[in-house]
């Protein structure tokens, strides 16, 4: 059966329905109903964490997948910066586990490789000039008050870890150093002498899901 990623527990949405069963949802689970809301459940109104992409940028993204564009759309850049800010906050709070961002903008593997090249070049170039830091600052200042603990408690009052959420956003200057560290090493995942992956804490690992070869590239 296909993966029921961000799927709902309705019989009609499960395939094959006579082969698998849906487990009860945990009160710590963020599924599509919580994120996007449900027209059938007034208790779930959705979370203000989804940003729409302008039609013009969708066209640029399509060109990028086809190898016809050499820059990232603005909203794409903003999403990368917001991830860097979020990762920097966690790192500043002594978070030790890996932090990842899944970028999935096309079903075509070739498009992901085109996107990878443009993204890597953009990160390296902007890190060298320092201009990405200003974009991170701008995105941080515009987004940090768009979704608050109050918003979360109203949209998902049954969330099991609501009392553990740290609602304080540090000033950008407090996380800038962590962002600089992340941008200081942009590379693939290297392999050690024993052929096992070697991960670094002071940088960003970029990889493409090379499912045809059953490996990461």
Residue ranges and their predicted role:
Residues 89, 93-216:
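Conserved C-terminal RecA-like helicase domain
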